[in-house]
């Protein structure tokens, strides 16, 4: 039973009943706090700590050295300067003028505004804020499905730990957040039949389509809900009626068209999904390496999902298809491990039997803990000295900050030849067209392969047309190409530090890139 009887005795009262306290001379003891209050205080403390810890761990190792954030910042700056959305590439010499869709334009603009006001700290503010939002949303999803507070708290914490490697300043944090929103709505509607919550989904997708291309994953989840309704027309206990879910999916597809590129964004999503070279060459797109605890967490969560689904009397169609989709996506690419994480949160929370926690805090109470957690994280950032100076020092250990300072001081010109990882930072810092950067979909498999061949010093490296025409080569000091250029009489070493080497043509006369006459110059001040 969940209710307490009048005969229940608290531990404090049992102590009062000891022989010493029962003597006639003993003074009456004050009545102890009622048990419900102590339980709710414990829940409040546990919830607040849950909200703080994931973002605190990020702040402990916070860095602004993410490779891709820099070309996003440059895109946001261009949008702010021109009050327009780019439709052609402006940043790479190899793809200058080709059609390009900045599908994360809203993310880029948001982060540029934060950077403009707060400097490198703005990047940390975005990331920590999104981690807090994801944690709160995930806990709300789990609480709606799991009646045991302790199980819900531990499960949410485990999911947050699993996604730890994704806590970097990327637009996929929005995708994780919106996916949790979507799954929360779908699971609650399936459980309660309250269809009005479905009205939130088109608005979510309209925003989603302007911050990250992986809104496609959200549409797949909606498609799974529709499939369940089609396959269980005679069952209504755990499905959404066919007409509402079909209209919701249609409305969400229409909502995604409210972006600067219209339906063309679906072609971009298709091209990215079927680009095999990127999944083999780009580390974050490769399969899980199982060298980190979060990798094994994904595996253990998937085992747990199989166990709870297998013991069901009747195969739960939505949960089973959701798990299958999550397994395919997450084990294909480590960047998408979040799909299995949030799918496991929903599946396990709704299927693990726990003790119903009496005296639970009101549903709205979690919102009261958010500002407390935010204030604690702000204080933690000061205590950990998370400031622009510290972030700059950390960034200089990963990105060629000093080498680029020398290149700008000496007025070295392009074309620039660089590797894949550093291209985004060069776009931001040098304001010269780069040879390649983190936009794998724009450059295509052929360019990615050509760059890898050159940088690893494989046969034919010296025939790379972009290397031949380079006016400046910025190279990791330990890269195979760097050692080859030291011996190449066509290049001379202009600068070197512990991280980067800077080469220029030995004859001192680089060939400048030709820009299409109908395009603005890529250098914009």
Question: Where are the regions that the model predicts?
Answer:
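Transmembrane-helix signature of polytopic, membrane-embedded enzymes
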Residues: 50, 138-161
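Membrane-interface alpha helices of multi-pass inner-membrane proteins
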Residues: 56, 159-163, 197-213, 251-256, ...
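Transmembrane catalytic cores of multi-pass membrane glycosyltransferases
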Residues: 68, 80, 85, 213-313
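Transmembrane-helix motifs of polytopic, lipid-linked glycan transferases
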Residues: 125-145
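Membrane-interface transmembrane helices that cradle and orient dolichyl/undecaprenyl
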Residues: 180-197, 304-312
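Short hydrophobic alpha-helices at membrane interfaces in multi-pass membrane enzymes
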Residues: 188-206, 242-247, 317-324
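Membrane-proximal, lumen/periplasm-facing interface regions of secretory-pathway glyco-
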Residues: 361-410, 422-424, 428-430, 440-442, ...
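Short periplasmic/luminal acceptor-recognition loop of GT-C membrane glycosyltransferases, typified by
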Residues: 408-446, 466, 470-477, 503
């Amino acid at each position: 039973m969940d209710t307490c009887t009048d005969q229940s005795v608290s531990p404090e009262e049992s102590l009062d009943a000891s022989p010493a306290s029962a003597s006639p001379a003993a003074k009456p003891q004050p009545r102890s706090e009622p048990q419900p209050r102590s339980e709710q205080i414990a829940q409040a403390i546990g919830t607040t700590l849950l909200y703080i810890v994931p973002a605190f761990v990020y702040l402990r190792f916070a860095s602004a050295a993410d490779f891709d954030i820099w070309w996003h910042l440059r895109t946001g700056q261009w949008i702010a300067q021109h009050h327009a959305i780019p439709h052609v590439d402006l940043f790479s010499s190899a793809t200058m003028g080709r059609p390009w869709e900045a599908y994360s334009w809203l993310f880029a603009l948001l982060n540029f505004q934060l950077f403009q006001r707060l400097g490198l700290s703005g990047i940390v503010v975005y990331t920590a804020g999104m981690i807090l939002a994801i944690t709160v949303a995930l806990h709300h999803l789990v609480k709606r499905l799991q009646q045991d507070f302790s199980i819900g708290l531990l499960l949410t914490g485990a999911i947050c730990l699993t996604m730890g490697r994704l806590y970097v300043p990327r637009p996929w944090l929005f995708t994780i957040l919106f996916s949790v929103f979507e799954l929360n709505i779908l699971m609650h509607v399936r459980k309660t039949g309250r269809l009005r919550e479905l009205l939130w989904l088109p608005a979510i997708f309209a925003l989603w389509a302007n911050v990250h291309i992986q809104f496609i994953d959200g549409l797949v989840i909606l498609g799974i809900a529709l499939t369940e309704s089609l396959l269980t027309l005679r069952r209504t206990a755990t499905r959404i009626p066919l007409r509402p879910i079909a209209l919701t999916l249609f409305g969400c597809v229409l909502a995604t068209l409210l972006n600067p590129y219209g339906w063309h964004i679906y072609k971009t999503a298709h091209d990215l999904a079927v680009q095999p070279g990127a999944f083999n060459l780009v580390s974050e797109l490769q399969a899980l390496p199982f060298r980190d605890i979060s990798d094994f967490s994904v595996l253990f969560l998937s085992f747990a999902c199989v166990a709870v689904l297998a013991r069901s009397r009747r195969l739960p169609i939505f949960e089973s298809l959701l798990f299958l989709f999550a397994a395919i996506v997450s084990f294909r690419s480590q960047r998408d491990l979040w799909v299995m994480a949030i799918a496991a949160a929903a599946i396990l929370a709704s299927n693990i039997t726990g003790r119903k926690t009496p005296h639970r805090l009101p549903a709205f109470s979690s919102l009261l803990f958010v500002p407390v957690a935010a204030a604690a994280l702000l204080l933690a950032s000061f205590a950990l000295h998370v400031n622009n100076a510290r972030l700059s020092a950390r960034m200089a250990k990963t990105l060629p900050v000093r080498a680029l300072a020398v290149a700008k001081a000496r007025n070295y010109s392009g074309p620039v030849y660089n590797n894949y990882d550093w291209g985004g930072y060069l776009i931001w810092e040098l304001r010269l067209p780069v040879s390649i950067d983190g936009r794998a979909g724009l450059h295509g498999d052929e360019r990615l392969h050509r760059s890898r061949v050159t940088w690893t010093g494989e046969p034919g490296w010296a025939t790379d047309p972009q290397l031949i025409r380079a006016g400046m080569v910025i190279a990791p000091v330990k890269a195979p190409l760097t050692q080859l250029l030291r011996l190449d009489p066509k290049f001379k070493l202009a600068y070197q530090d512990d991280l980067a080497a800077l080469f220029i043509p030995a004859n001192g006369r680089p060939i400048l890139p030709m820009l299409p006459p109908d395009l603005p110059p890529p250098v914009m001040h």
